Amino acid sequence: MIVCKSSAEIETMHRAGIVVWEVLNELRMMVAPGVSTLDLDRIAERRAAEHGARPAFKGYRGYPASLCASINEEVVHGIPSAGRKLNEGDLVSLDYGVELDGYFGDAAVTVPVGKVRSELDTLMRVTRESLDRAIEKARAGNRLSDVGAAVQEWVERHGFSVVREFVGHGIGTRMHEEPSVLNYGQPGHGPRLQEGMVLAIEPMVNQGTANVRVLEDGWTAVTADGKPSAHFEHTVAVTANGPWILTRPRDVSGPAW
């Protein structure tokens, strides 16, 4: 069942979202050659506590960390470790969520490590733009599939592929709620979006094949062909005034990331 949130609940989710925004922005400023993904995870966990929040991922279905840090061909759910250090030219996706006062916020950003190849810049840009286009469709009266169709159309127009095995989701008092928010499909299908719905919209886009596989750790998903992937995400509320990005401050406008 899709649960619509009250204005008060959405305000609480915005407070959780601001914690996510602030932590992710601190982490992406830390990204540099030689930094380990465990270094980033430790900061993510510490900052949640300083804000009176709880890291949403740690312990969720047994996940062992507060942050997902996925490098290059790793699509999502990369487990931080001391031995996994960033190198010049890498892409790293930072996916982070918190629970604050009983409500969740969730966002992700892909960050270049130093200078990256131009085709990786393009992959990041197209993925980020696909999120912008998806968020624009998160309006009352539209169909749920309009969101994913916007992602797929933009991504495939630029010669990249959309991951099917992992999708966005509803979010609220639980990290994952109904509905599933696909990043593909035909427009005009699924439930109509209503005021109070809150969606975690998160395109995952591969340079090569859309196919992925999960490593033996049971978490890290990688592209089947070893080519790089990018991932951007925001938590978005459907309101009377249009989409409201809850995982950034009210006074920030323009592109989602």
Describe these PLM feature segments.
Residues 1-257:
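Active-site neighborhoods and metal-handling regions in enzymes and metal-associated proteins
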